[in-house]
């Protein structure tokens, strides 16, 4: 049987001090420091439960640890102990419930001595009970009894840790609806039980704080924001309120679940996560300043002043459910006011105001409030079961039926809710067999249909629970009482004690070193060193350096010779090397240690380490590199980089894991200045005189790229730095392409085996976080500082798969990587748009999408209703017309006629033309949707179609031909162009008669169809040409050879080669206003190019998307992007941006779901982007909000 208490944990000030900003050591009494895990019962290796999460210390003391001159003072409320719950969410979405008591406790004497603190100094400490069971009350009551017992003047009859151990080890989880467990903490009797499984889920909290902090309208507004999955930030000056309100609202949305990021109490230094674009519910203390954050689109709920603010309107719950919900809540909260005009004891007034409502708030009120919200869901989703066929819910049909019954158009709130992850998750659970028997929503719908009371669906308690008593251990009678002046530490092992001494000795030594070598000597005081000549001082320093290096050499060799039963991390050798590196202000220890490794490698050592040695060496190198980087000692950093690439261990699959891969958290690798210095160092090394300069530069840059990949630097950031260095060396585009290919190749090899690096975790420390003083099997070799653990945990929540969502927060933290300086600031990062509609109708993958523009239908005054339509084609052989102006009923018509996959679509004022794998081109009447003509003549699948003026159609196919058709006669007028292979892309200028086509033969062909002659064959690409764009005399082509090329149409010459993508260039666009070029590749990268001193230069890189760029559409002020990972983005160029292509600024991005997209089309006039997925679903994003 499981236990209700999994761990008892103590967090506070550890022997290694770090500020919340990551600075090592003591930095004053007014500074906040990172909390550490001090004690834990039971040890992880003795527990059946997973270890407490590493972010626990950061989360239970969210502000950090502060020093105080006194402990509890009755006249100072700020010194009072605080009791509050927190909830942590793991990567799989499961919750960990923690009860905390934070208080001021005396700092240990050895820490005071090591850091020279004032005597009787106090610091923040927190004791916690950790459980996966949501029993908030028993967790809090038990913890408070422990705390009172510790500081009681009467003391306890047993040592405090014995009481804790017995309680944690012996109190079982009660059987739901059957048991009540009784146990005692000293002389206090406590109990715990759980509701039946067929009842509402256990909510061991009171909902009263929620209804006390928010009035009815704000409560409903918060409830609605949760249902439509907005970004929600809850503020309060009390930790408890943040957790209680968050948990309460999660219970009120039953039977649905909040599947987005959930952090009821965010640690203070994580405030920057509020700007994340992913939906979240987070709580933040009111003292934390958010004025420098964009906060655009965030729903801010201020519990202290009963206020909700947001820059984006929250849709209202539809009627009549909104009025019913509001009245029911008012009736519960204010029964006397609601029923003041009713005659008591007459008619139904007694039923309307139950007697229990006149009592103080209790569990009955909690239950009734939850049922009120369940009734709201039952009404809104009335009859939803009738629209589930073959395990698929028909949203459109349900909305149409509801619109007919309410005589209202589809409500925006309901449309958004039915497309939410919460609703989709509920449907999946509902369709599983284990969910149907306990589905209270459907039980309530059935009960209401029979005219029964809503409370009748809840199980009746027919019997008293069985009492299970946990007997106290027998204690020999003794007059001894255990009293404490501070919360006691558990007993440390010899190994833990030794680790603690090493950390404190290193800290003390660093202070002494700083004391012996002050920045400047006091005036008038001559030291011994002042009497040395410069030569004597140099000789003395040289002797000191030599002495340290000799000691390090011996320590290093002894560290490698430790026996298999000896732990290097707890050895004297490791501790001494660490102290020499950490306490040496001049860097002699760090550089000397790296030199020892280098000499050992030169002597013939192969660099292979055991698992334990690998951990020790890795952490020592981290410390050495971090210290060297802080001193700008780039030569030591360079040497460490090189030796780390030589030392390795073998993993379980006999694959080498190099030390270098584990140094990624050090910030120096992000700095261009380091890599430029390293490249210059490599260029200074001896080289074969017969090698030309370009080849030498390329070889040296390959070495740089190898180290970048070995570290795990993100591909885009690594390439930006390599490209910058290469451009300064004037490398040609062919060598640039080779370099790009090499970097991508080694990156793919690394990611293929090790996975993507968590590069964006905050690098708080450059070295090993020293072992915890009482590290009861909780410290392992990968332990991070608690702040880094906290940030890593938050990032893992943003990046985890949540109901098919795959959204990497690392891309949120840095949307744009610009090789100059990014102009997309936090303020310019516009809000995530939630207005995304899901359009269903196709039975196969969507393979073609077309946007009907005003120019296409000659809409000069805005009276054409078809301007703004989207037209889609699919593998189901159907063409569908969608009207975005009809919310909930977007499907306008379905065109049937093709027998193969639809590959291309175009239209004009009156007609639609589509091309298919069935070798045919069909022309449809746009108004009547009737099939007008079927044009046959191609010998292979049709890949491109284009409507022209004068009832003409231009088509291209995989047979290599381009044909002109006259729709009126159903005849092919002429084959206007021929290529040697399949045509994949087509452009035509109707005003000049110039036609351009390209495809698999790697040649771009240009014809003048009016003269019937071919003008040019543009050769240069080495692989398929995927996309072309022609504007006036400029032709742009994008190819699978990773380049785009710019050509002159009149001269037939290549004006520029646009290289540096890491994959096929699948989309190209010309921005006519600024005469810039935009390219998108399979690497997910957008590159903006503009003319610069007679050439074309890349001026901006955008890393917002993580998969192939499928569509780029540039207008005068708007730019729409769509990618294969179902992500979209809209850019805006302000009128004052000038004529530079770099003036494009990210306007907003929509929420993204995990789906593979085949095609994208955008309507910039209405700021809409539509994507077609492999699952047959279209996602229509409407970003129409005034600027």
Curated annotation (Swiss-Prot):
The biological processes this protein is annotated with in GO are:
cytokinesis by cell plate formation; guard mother cell cytokinesis; multidimensional cell growth; negative regulation of innate immune response
Pfam families hit by this protein? Beta-prop_DCAF4 (PF23761), DENN (PF02141), uDENN (PF03456), WD40 (PF00400)
Q: Which UniProt keywords apply?
A: Cell cycle, Cell division, Cell membrane, Cytoplasmic vesicle, Growth regulation, Membrane, Repeat, WD repeat
Domain (uDENN) spans 19-179
Per the database record, which ranges form the dDENN domain?
332-437
State its location(s): Cell membrane; Cytoplasmic vesicle, Clathrin-coated vesicle
Which SMART domains does the record associate with it?
dDENN, DENN, uDENN, WD40
Q: Where is the composition biased (Polar residues)?
A: 779-793
| Cysteine pairings via disulfide bonds | none
Carries keyword Ribonucleoprotein? no
Region (Disordered) residue ranges read: 508-536, 765-793
Report, from the record, the phenotype seen after gene disruption: Defects in seedling development, root elongation, leaf expansion, flower morphogenesis and fertility due to defective cytokinesis in epidermal cells.
Source taxon at top rank: Eukaryota
Membrane topology according to the record:
Peripheral membrane protein
User: Domain named cDENN: which ranges?
Assistant: 199-330
WD repeats, residue ranges? 841-892, 897-934, 937-975, 978-1017, 1020-1057, 1060-1099, 1104-1141, 1152-1187
What is its quaternary makeup? Interacts with FLS2.
- Job description of the protein: Involved in growth and development through its role in cytokinesis and polarized cell expansion. Required for plasma membrane internalization. May function in clathrin-mediated membrane trafficking, including plasma membrane endocytosis, essential to both cytokinesis and cell expansion. Acts as a negative regulator of basal resistance against bacteria.
Q: What is this protein called?
A: DENN domain and WD repeat-containing protein SCD1
Q: Which organism is it from?
A: Arabidopsis thaliana (Mouse-ear cress)
């Amino acid at each position: 049987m499981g236990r209700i208490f999994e761990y008892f944990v103590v967090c506070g000030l550890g022997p290694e001090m770090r500020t919340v900003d990551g600075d090592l050591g003591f930095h004053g009494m007014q500074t906040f420091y990172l909390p550490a895990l001090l004690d834990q019962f039971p040890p992880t290796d003795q527990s059946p439960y997973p270890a407490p999460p590493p972010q626990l210390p950061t989360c239970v003391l969210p502000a950090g640890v502060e020093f105080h001159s006194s402990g509890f003072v009755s006249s100072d409320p700020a010194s009072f102990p605080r009791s509050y719950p927190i909830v942590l969410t793991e990567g799989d979405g499961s919750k960990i419930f923690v009860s905390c008591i934070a208080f001021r406790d005396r700092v240990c004497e050895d820490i005071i001595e090591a850091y020279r603190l004032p005597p009787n100094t106090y610091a923040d400490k927190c004791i916690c009970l950790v459980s996966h069971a949501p029993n908030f009350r028993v967790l809090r009551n038990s913890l408070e009894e422990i705390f009172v017992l510790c500081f009681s003047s009467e003391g306890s009859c047993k040592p405090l840790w014995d009481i804790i151990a017995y309680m944690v080890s012996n109190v079982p989880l009660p059987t739901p609806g059957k048991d009540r467990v009784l146990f005692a903490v000293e002389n206090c009797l406590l109990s715990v039980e759980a509701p039946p499984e067929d009842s509402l889920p256990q909510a061991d909290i009171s909902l009263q704080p929620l209804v006390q902090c928010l009035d009815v309208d704000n409560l409903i507004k918060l409830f609605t924001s949760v249902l439509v999955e907005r970004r929600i930030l809850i503020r309060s000056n009390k930790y408890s309120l943040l957790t209680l309100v968050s948990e309460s609202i999660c219970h009120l949305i039953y039977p649905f679940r909040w599947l987005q990021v959930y952090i009821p109490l965010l640690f203070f230094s994580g405030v920057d996560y509020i700007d994340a674009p992913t939906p979240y519910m987070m709580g933040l203390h009111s003292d934390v300043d958010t004025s420098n954050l964009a906060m655009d689109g965030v729903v801010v709920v201020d519990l202290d002043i009963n206020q909700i603010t947001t820059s984006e309107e929250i849709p209202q719950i539809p009627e009549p459910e909104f009025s019913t919900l509001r009245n029911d809540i008012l009736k519960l909260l204010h029964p006397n006011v609601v029923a003041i005009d009713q005659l008591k004891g007459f008619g139904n007034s007694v039923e309307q105001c139950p007697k229990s409502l006149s009592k103080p708030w209790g569990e009955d009120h909690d239950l009734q409030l939850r049922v009120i919200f369940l009734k709201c869901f039952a009404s809104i989703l009335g009859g939803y079961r009738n629209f589930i066929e073959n395990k698929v819910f028909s949203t459109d049909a349900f909305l149409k039926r509801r619109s007919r019954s309410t005589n209202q158009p589809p409500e925006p709130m309901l449309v958004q809710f039915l497309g939410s992850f919460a609703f989709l998750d509920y449907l999946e659970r509902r369709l599983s067999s284990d969910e149907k028997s306990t589905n209270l929503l459907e039980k309530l719908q059935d009960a209401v249909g029979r005219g029964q009371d809503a409370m009748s669906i809840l199980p009746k308690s027919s019997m008293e629970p069985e009492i299970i008593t946990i007997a106290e251990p027998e204690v020999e009678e003794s007059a001894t009482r255990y009293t404490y002046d501070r919360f006691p530490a558990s007993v440390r092992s010899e190994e833990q004690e030794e680790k603690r001494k090493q950390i404190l000795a290193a800290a003390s030594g660093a202070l002494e070193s700083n004391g012996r070598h002050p920045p400047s000597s006091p005036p008038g005081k001559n030291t011994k060193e002042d009497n040395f000549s410069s030569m004597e001082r140099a000789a003395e320093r040289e002797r000191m350096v030599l002495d340290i290096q000799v000691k390090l050499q011996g320590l290093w060799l002894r560290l490698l010779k430790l026996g298999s039963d000896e732990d290097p991390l707890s050895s004297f050798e490791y501790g001494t090397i660490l102290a020499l590196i950490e306490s040496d202000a001049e860097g002699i220890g760090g550089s000397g240690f790296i030199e020892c490794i280098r000499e050992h490698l030169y002597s013939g050592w192969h660099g292979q380490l055991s698992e334990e040695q690998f951990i020790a060496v890795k952490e020592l190198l981290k410390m050495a590199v971090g210290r060297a980087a802080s001193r700008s000692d780039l030569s030591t950093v360079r040497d460490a980089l090189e030796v780390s690439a030589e030392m390795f261990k073998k993993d379980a699959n006999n694959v080498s894991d190099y030390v270098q891969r584990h140094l990624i958290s050090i910030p120096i690798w992000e700095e261009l200045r380091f890599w430029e210095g390293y490249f210059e160092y490599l260029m200074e090394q001896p080289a074969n005189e017969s090698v030309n300069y370009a080849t030498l530069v390329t070889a040296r840059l390959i070495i740089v790229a190898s180290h970048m990949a070995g570290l795990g630097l993100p591909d885009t950031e690594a390439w930006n730095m390599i490209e910058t260095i290469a451009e300064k060396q004037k490398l040609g585009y062919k060598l640039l392409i080779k370099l790009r290919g090499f970097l991508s190749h080694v990156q793919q090899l690394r990611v293929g085996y090790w996975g993507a690096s968590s590069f964006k975790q905050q690098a708080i420390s450059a070295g090993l976080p020293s072992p915890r003083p009482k590290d009861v099997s909780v410290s392992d070799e990968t332990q991070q500082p608690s702040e880094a653990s906290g940030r890593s945990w938050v990032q893992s929540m943003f990046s985890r798969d949540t109901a098919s969502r795959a959204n990497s927060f690392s891309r949120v933290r840095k949307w744009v990587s610009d090789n100059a300086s990014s102009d997309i600031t936090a303020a310019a990062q516009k809000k995530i748009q939630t207005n995304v509609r899901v359009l269903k109708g196709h039975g196969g993958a969507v393979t073609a999408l077309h946007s009907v523009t005003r120019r296409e239908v000659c809409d000069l005054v805005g009276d054409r209703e078809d301007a703004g339509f989207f037209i889609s084609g699919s593998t189901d052989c159907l063409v569908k017309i969608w009207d975005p102006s009809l919310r909930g009923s977007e499907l306008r018509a379905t065109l049937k006629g093709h027998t193969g996959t639809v590959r291309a679509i175009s239209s004009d004022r009156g007609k639609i033309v589509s091309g298919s794998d069935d070798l045919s081109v069909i022309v449809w009447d746009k108004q009547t949707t009737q099939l007008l003509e079927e044009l046959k003549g191609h010998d292979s699948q049709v890949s491109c179609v284009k409507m022209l003026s004068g009832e003409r159609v231009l088509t291209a196919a995989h047979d290599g031909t381009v044909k002109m058709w006259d729709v009126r006669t159903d005849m092919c007028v002429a084959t206007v162009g021929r290529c040697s292979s399949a045509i994949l892309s087509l452009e035509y200028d109707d005003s000049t008669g110039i036609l351009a086509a390209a495809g698999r033969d790697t040649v771009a062909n240009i014809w003048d169809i009016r003269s019937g002659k071919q003008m040019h064959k543009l050769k240069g690409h080495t692989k398929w040409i995927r996309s072309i764009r022609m504007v006036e005399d400029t032709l742009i082509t994008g190819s699978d050879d990773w380049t785009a090329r710019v050509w002159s149409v009149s001269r037939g010459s290549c004006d520029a080669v646009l290289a540096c993508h890491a994959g096929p260039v699948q989309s190209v666009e010309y921005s006519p206003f600024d005469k810039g070029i935009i390219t998108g590749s399979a690497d997910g990268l957008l590159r903006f190019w503009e003319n610069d001193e007679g050439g074309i230069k890349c001026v901006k890189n955008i890393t917002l998307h993580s998969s192939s760029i499928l569509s780029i559409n540039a207008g005068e002020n708007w730019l729409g992007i769509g990618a294969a990972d179902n992500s979209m983005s809209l850019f805006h160029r302000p009128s004052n941006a000038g004529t530079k292509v770099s003036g494009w600024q990210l306007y907003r991005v929509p929420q993204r779901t995990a789906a593979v997209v085949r095609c994208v089309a955008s309507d910039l006039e209405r700021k809409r982007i539509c994507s077609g997925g492999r699952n047959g679903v279209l996602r229509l994003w409407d970003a129409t909000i005034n600027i």
